[in-house]
Amino acid sequence: GDAEIAALRASLVIPPGAPVLLALPGSRLGEVRRHCGPFGAVVALLAQRLPGLRVILPTVGAVAEPVRALTQDWAAPPDILDPRGLSPAVADARKWAGFAVADAALAASGTVTLELAAAGTPMVAAYRTHPLTAQIVRRLVRVETANLVNLVAGSRVVPEFLQEYFQPPAVADALTPLFSASPERAAQAEDAARVLKALGAEGPPPALRAARSVLAALDRRRLRL
Protein backbone atom coordinates (compact mmCIF):
# COMPACT_ATOMS: atom_id res chain seq x y z
CA GLY A 1 0.00 0.00 0.00
CA ASP A 2 0.90 3.68 0.06
CA ALA A 3 2.42 3.38 3.53
CA GLU A 4 4.83 0.67 2.40
CA ILE A 5 5.78 2.67 -0.70
CA ALA A 6 6.47 5.81 1.34
CA ALA A 7 8.44 3.80 3.89
CA LEU A 8 10.59 2.20 1.19
CA ARG A 9 11.33 5.54 -0.47
CA ALA A 10 12.31 6.98 2.90
CA SER A 11 14.47 4.02 3.92
CA LEU A 12 16.33 4.08 0.59
CA VAL A 13 16.53 7.90 0.60
CA ILE A 14 15.17 8.22 -2.93
CA PRO A 15 14.72 11.91 -3.79
CA PRO A 16 11.42 12.99 -5.37
CA GLY A 17 11.69 12.85 -9.13
CA ALA A 18 14.74 10.58 -9.20
CA PRO A 19 14.51 7.97 -11.98
CA VAL A 20 14.19 4.47 -10.52
CA LEU A 21 14.93 1.21 -12.33
CA LEU A 22 13.79 -2.13 -10.95
CA ALA A 23 16.31 -4.87 -11.80
CA LEU A 24 15.16 -8.48 -11.66
CA PRO A 25 17.99 -10.72 -12.86
CA GLY A 26 16.38 -13.96 -11.66
CA SER A 27 16.01 -16.06 -8.55
CA ARG A 28 18.41 -18.91 -9.31
CA LEU A 29 22.18 -18.81 -9.04
CA GLY A 30 22.77 -19.62 -12.70
CA GLU A 31 20.41 -16.85 -13.76
CA VAL A 32 22.02 -14.16 -11.65
CA ARG A 33 25.49 -15.23 -12.78
CA ARG A 34 24.45 -14.95 -16.43
CA HIS A 35 22.45 -11.76 -16.08
CA CYS A 36 24.17 -9.47 -13.57
CA GLY A 37 27.00 -8.65 -16.00
CA PRO A 38 24.82 -7.55 -18.94
CA PHE A 39 22.27 -5.99 -16.58
CA GLY A 40 25.12 -3.91 -15.17
CA ALA A 41 26.08 -2.81 -18.68
CA VAL A 42 22.50 -1.66 -19.25
CA VAL A 43 22.56 0.25 -15.96
CA ALA A 44 25.80 1.99 -17.00
CA LEU A 45 24.18 3.21 -20.22
CA LEU A 46 21.03 4.36 -18.44
CA ALA A 47 23.04 6.17 -15.77
CA GLN A 48 24.60 8.30 -18.52
CA ARG A 49 21.16 9.22 -19.87
CA LEU A 50 19.23 9.54 -16.61
CA PRO A 51 21.10 11.65 -14.02
CA GLY A 52 20.54 10.48 -10.47
CA LEU A 53 19.40 7.01 -11.54
CA ARG A 54 18.55 4.70 -8.66
CA VAL A 55 18.29 0.93 -8.97
CA ILE A 56 16.18 -1.34 -6.76
CA LEU A 57 16.87 -5.07 -6.88
CA PRO A 58 14.52 -7.42 -5.00
CA THR A 59 16.09 -10.82 -4.50
CA VAL A 60 15.59 -14.09 -2.66
CA GLY A 61 17.66 -15.19 0.30
CA ALA A 62 19.36 -18.05 -1.52
CA VAL A 63 21.11 -15.73 -3.98
CA ALA A 64 21.30 -12.50 -1.97
CA GLU A 65 25.04 -12.71 -1.33
CA PRO A 66 26.03 -13.61 -4.92
CA VAL A 67 23.80 -10.78 -6.17
CA ARG A 68 25.48 -8.34 -3.80
CA ALA A 69 28.93 -9.40 -5.01
CA LEU A 70 27.98 -9.36 -8.69
CA THR A 71 26.40 -5.90 -8.59
CA GLN A 72 28.76 -3.96 -6.33
CA ASP A 73 30.59 -2.43 -9.31
CA TRP A 74 27.49 -1.30 -11.21
CA ALA A 75 27.54 2.37 -12.25
CA ALA A 76 24.49 2.84 -10.03
CA PRO A 77 24.91 0.20 -7.28
CA PRO A 78 21.49 -1.26 -6.52
CA ASP A 79 19.54 -1.05 -3.31
CA ILE A 80 19.09 -4.78 -2.71
CA LEU A 81 15.83 -5.84 -1.08
CA ASP A 82 17.05 -8.85 0.88
CA PRO A 83 14.21 -10.84 2.48
CA ARG A 84 16.40 -12.60 5.03
CA GLY A 85 15.41 -11.77 8.58
CA LEU A 86 11.96 -10.57 7.53
CA SER A 87 8.65 -12.37 7.78
CA PRO A 88 7.29 -13.59 4.43
CA ALA A 89 4.48 -11.03 4.59
CA VAL A 90 6.82 -8.11 5.26
CA ALA A 91 9.30 -9.25 2.60
CA ASP A 92 6.51 -9.59 0.04
CA ALA A 93 5.08 -6.16 0.88
CA ARG A 94 8.55 -4.64 0.54
CA LYS A 95 9.00 -6.30 -2.87
CA TRP A 96 5.67 -4.97 -4.13
CA ALA A 97 6.56 -1.51 -2.81
CA GLY A 98 9.74 -1.73 -4.89
CA PHE A 99 7.63 -2.53 -7.94
CA ALA A 100 5.45 0.51 -7.27
CA VAL A 101 8.36 2.90 -6.64
CA ALA A 102 10.10 1.99 -9.92
CA ASP A 103 9.53 3.89 -13.14
CA ALA A 104 10.50 0.87 -15.24
CA ALA A 105 11.83 -2.66 -14.84
CA LEU A 106 14.46 -4.81 -16.50
CA ALA A 107 13.40 -8.39 -15.86
CA ALA A 108 14.49 -11.87 -16.75
CA SER A 109 11.56 -13.42 -18.62
CA GLY A 110 9.28 -15.47 -16.41
CA THR A 111 6.34 -15.25 -14.07
CA VAL A 112 7.71 -12.01 -12.61
CA THR A 113 6.56 -10.26 -15.78
CA LEU A 114 2.95 -11.00 -14.79
CA GLU A 115 3.64 -9.52 -11.35
CA LEU A 116 5.03 -6.39 -12.98
CA ALA A 117 1.93 -6.10 -15.15
CA ALA A 118 -0.23 -6.40 -12.03
CA ALA A 119 1.82 -3.65 -10.38
CA GLY A 120 1.55 -1.41 -13.44
CA THR A 121 5.33 -1.26 -13.87
CA PRO A 122 6.41 -1.03 -17.53
CA MET A 123 9.21 -3.38 -18.42
CA VAL A 124 11.76 -4.78 -20.80
CA ALA A 125 12.42 -8.52 -20.65
CA ALA A 126 15.88 -9.96 -21.26
CA TYR A 127 17.17 -13.47 -20.74
CA ARG A 128 20.17 -15.63 -21.47
CA THR A 129 20.48 -19.35 -20.92
CA HIS A 130 23.05 -21.93 -21.97
CA PRO A 131 23.22 -22.01 -25.80
CA LEU A 132 22.49 -25.75 -25.91
CA THR A 133 19.44 -25.29 -23.70
CA ALA A 134 18.24 -22.49 -25.94
CA GLN A 135 18.66 -24.65 -29.03
CA ILE A 136 16.60 -27.46 -27.49
CA VAL A 137 13.87 -25.05 -26.37
CA ARG A 138 13.63 -23.50 -29.83
CA ARG A 139 13.12 -26.96 -31.32
CA LEU A 140 10.45 -27.98 -28.82
CA VAL A 141 8.54 -24.77 -28.05
CA ARG A 142 6.80 -23.17 -31.00
CA VAL A 143 5.85 -19.73 -29.73
CA GLU A 144 7.24 -16.39 -30.81
CA THR A 145 7.73 -14.98 -27.31
CA ALA A 146 8.98 -16.20 -23.95
CA ASN A 147 7.31 -13.30 -22.15
CA LEU A 148 4.09 -14.24 -20.38
CA VAL A 149 2.62 -10.73 -20.70
CA ASN A 150 3.07 -10.75 -24.48
CA LEU A 151 1.82 -14.33 -24.66
CA VAL A 152 -1.39 -13.71 -22.74
CA ALA A 153 -2.04 -10.32 -24.40
CA GLY A 154 -1.33 -11.68 -27.87
CA SER A 155 1.10 -8.86 -28.65
CA ARG A 156 4.76 -7.93 -28.58
CA VAL A 157 4.34 -4.63 -26.73
CA VAL A 158 6.84 -5.64 -24.03
CA PRO A 159 10.30 -5.45 -25.66
CA GLU A 160 12.07 -8.77 -25.33
CA PHE A 161 15.73 -9.63 -25.88
CA LEU A 162 16.68 -13.31 -25.75
CA GLN A 163 20.04 -15.02 -26.09
CA GLU A 164 22.26 -13.33 -28.70
CA TYR A 165 19.73 -10.50 -29.04
CA PHE A 166 20.32 -9.52 -25.41
CA GLN A 167 22.71 -6.67 -26.20
CA PRO A 168 22.94 -3.89 -23.56
CA PRO A 169 22.70 -0.93 -25.99
CA ALA A 170 19.48 -2.29 -27.52
CA VAL A 171 18.02 -3.02 -24.09
CA ALA A 172 18.92 0.46 -22.81
CA ASP A 173 17.31 2.02 -25.88
CA ALA A 174 14.10 0.07 -25.20
CA LEU A 175 14.06 1.04 -21.52
CA THR A 176 14.76 4.76 -21.94
CA PRO A 177 11.28 5.83 -23.17
CA LEU A 178 9.62 4.01 -20.28
CA PHE A 179 10.96 6.64 -17.88
CA SER A 180 8.71 9.33 -19.38
CA ALA A 181 5.09 9.72 -20.48
CA SER A 182 5.85 8.06 -23.81
CA PRO A 183 3.68 6.12 -26.28
CA GLU A 184 5.67 3.01 -25.34
CA ARG A 185 4.76 3.42 -21.68
CA ALA A 186 1.09 4.01 -22.52
CA ALA A 187 0.98 0.93 -24.77
CA GLN A 188 2.32 -1.25 -21.97
CA ALA A 189 -0.31 0.11 -19.57
CA GLU A 190 -3.05 -0.84 -22.05
CA ASP A 191 -1.63 -4.33 -22.50
CA ALA A 192 -1.27 -4.81 -18.75
CA ALA A 193 -4.96 -4.02 -18.34
CA ARG A 194 -5.83 -6.60 -21.02
CA VAL A 195 -3.65 -9.21 -19.34
CA LEU A 196 -5.20 -8.65 -15.92
CA LYS A 197 -8.67 -8.87 -17.45
CA ALA A 198 -7.72 -12.10 -19.24
CA LEU A 199 -6.47 -13.62 -16.00
CA GLY A 200 -9.63 -12.53 -14.21
CA ALA A 201 -10.05 -10.73 -10.92
CA GLU A 202 -12.25 -13.49 -9.49
CA GLY A 203 -12.72 -17.21 -9.92
CA PRO A 204 -10.01 -19.89 -9.75
CA PRO A 205 -6.73 -19.28 -7.91
CA PRO A 206 -4.37 -16.83 -9.70
CA ALA A 207 -1.79 -19.50 -10.56
CA LEU A 208 -4.45 -21.68 -12.18
CA ARG A 209 -5.92 -18.74 -14.08
CA ALA A 210 -2.46 -17.78 -15.32
CA ALA A 211 -1.68 -21.33 -16.40
CA ARG A 212 -4.98 -21.66 -18.28
CA SER A 213 -4.44 -18.33 -20.04
CA VAL A 214 -0.91 -19.24 -21.06
CA LEU A 215 -2.00 -22.66 -22.35
CA ALA A 216 -4.81 -21.05 -24.33
CA ALA A 217 -2.39 -18.53 -25.81
CA LEU A 218 0.05 -21.29 -26.72
CA ASP A 219 -2.72 -23.17 -28.47
CA ARG A 220 -3.70 -20.06 -30.45
CA ARG A 221 -0.19 -19.12 -31.48
CA ARG A 222 1.88 -22.09 -32.57
CA LEU A 223 4.68 -19.98 -33.94
CA ARG A 224 8.41 -20.55 -33.84
CA LEU A 225 10.38 -18.92 -30.98
Residue ranges of model-derived segments:
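Nucleotide-activated sugar donor-binding and catalytic core shared by glycosyltransferases
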Residues: 1-225
